[in-house]
Amino acid sequence: MANVTLGGNPIEVGGALPSVGAKAPAFTLVGKDLKDVSLADFAGKRKVLNIVPSLDTPVCATSTRKFNEAVSKLENTVVFSISADLPFAAGRFCTTEGLDNVVPLSTFRDAGFKQAYGVDIKTGPLAGLTARAVVVLDANDNVLHAQLVPEIKEEPNYDAALAALK
């Protein structure tokens, strides 16, 4: 079990973040139209998994916008914005913001994702949500970069995540 902080207060996070060089765990989450979306649906594409507690928070919204802008300049790359938000809310956010390179996905039907990716918040006021993390995958779903952000209120290391795609 990993530990992160929320405003400096310790929070326990269950599961283990996938290791660089490992094959990413398969998953099936819920898209904005309530249909299942799997990692395999994007076979052959590079992926940035922007895992956030909720798109209704400023830092989560900012990271989603920044990754959308960054991958607009890259070929064969998609951003998954993964949270426990309901698919309707996540879809509305991406549509309203014009985030064409982001696929919003919800964990609300599958808590297994949180454990498989080491982002299952177990304690504190955000228990049940996903911790902030970024996992970058190549076109064959090998992990190129993985960061569990140590302070939930802080943004991820964009430069390190995007450098993994170069």
Swiss-Prot record:
CDD domains: PRX_Atyp2cys
Disulphide bridges, residue numbers: 60-94
Stretches that traverse the bilayer: none
Domain spans labelled Thioredoxin: 18-166
HAMAP family recorded: Tpx
Further remark: The active site is a conserved redox-active cysteine residue, the peroxidatic cysteine (C(P)), which makes the nucleophilic attack on the peroxide substrate. The peroxide oxidizes the C(P)-SH to cysteine sulfenic acid (C(P)-SOH), which then reacts with another cysteine residue, the resolving cysteine (C(R)), to form a disulfide bridge. The disulfide is subsequently reduced by an appropriate electron donor to complete the catalytic cycle. In this atypical 2-Cys peroxiredoxin, C(R) is present in the same subunit to form an intramolecular disulfide.
Name of the protein: Thiol peroxidase
Upper taxonomic lineage: Bacteria, Pseudomonadati, Pseudomonadota, Betaproteobacteria, Burkholderiales
